[in-house]
């Protein structure tokens, strides 16, 4: 009764969890995205943004965030790309780490260019909301499509017979394996 706002971070939640949470508590979940190397980069910042279940929200005003494709070019709305933080052209982004401990080579490789690449894949809708797909190294290519475990899990949990599921990438990204629990309601 005293909780007024609920924020989540880490791995994204499936849309079905958002629905169930709101039905049980009457409260919306405000999702965010960040890394150990940074503070919150993208979020459903309450009360300025109406959360869209499953979306990680919009970029923090502290950061110049974009999505870049495999050719290093900015993505169009609806196109998947890697989440990047602009490093050049202004002061160092507040809350972003400044290097890897005792590893100048890795620091230069990741922080020496125009962008810091989070290695996380997302897409942006026409309203500026970002939708997390997965880690770049946690996505498989199937029939020309890039598929992340989260997308498959989200689709499966919409089915009434699935309470929970987990999708894992096996054999060096060659296939996915699915584990689920039956409807226990």
Feature names for model-found ranges:
Residues 1-51, 64:
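Gly/Ser/Thr-rich phosphate-binding loop
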Residues 59-62, 73-109, 147:
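Conserved ATP/PPi-binding loop(s) of AMP-dependent carboxylate-activating enzymes
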Residues 10, 34, 57, 120, ...:
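Active-site glycine-centered loops adjacent to acidic/histidine catalytic or metal-binding residues
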Residues 19, 54, 105, 154:
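Active-site phosphate/pyrophosphate- and oxyanion-stabilizing loops and adjacent acidic/basic residues
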Residues 55-62, 116:
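Short coil-to-beta-strand transition motifs
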Residues 69-71, 80, 112, 126-127, ...:
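Residue-level recognition of short loop/turn positions
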Residues 106, 119-185:
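AMP-binding/adenylate-forming catalytic core of the ANL superfamily
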Residues 7-9, 68-70, 86, 102, ...:
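Thr-Gly-centered strand-to-loop micro-motif
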């Amino acid at each position: 009764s005293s909780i007024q706002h609920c924020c989540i971070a880490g791995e994204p939640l499936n849309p079905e969890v958002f629905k169930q949470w709101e039905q049980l508590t009457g409260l919306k979940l405000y999702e965010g995205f960040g890394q150990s190397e940074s503070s919150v980069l993208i979020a459903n910042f309450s009360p300025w943004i109406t959360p869209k279940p499953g979306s990680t929200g919009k970029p923090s005003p502290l950061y110049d965030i974009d999505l870049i494709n495999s050719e290093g070019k900015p993505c169009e709305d609806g196109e998947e790309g890697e989440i990047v933080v602009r490093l050049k052209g202004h002061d160092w982004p507040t809350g972003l780490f400044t290097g890897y401990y005792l590893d100048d080579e890795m620091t230069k490789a990741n922080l020496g260019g125009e962008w810091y690449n989070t290695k996380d894949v997302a897409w942006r809708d026409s309203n500026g909301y970002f939708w997390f797909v997965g880690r770049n190294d946690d996505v498989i290519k199937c029939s020309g499509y890039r598929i992340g475990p989260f997308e498959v899990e989200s689709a499966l949990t919409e089915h009434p017979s699935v309470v929970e599921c987990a999708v894992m990438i096996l054999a060096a990204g060659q296939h996915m394996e699915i584990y689920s629990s039956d409807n226990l309601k």
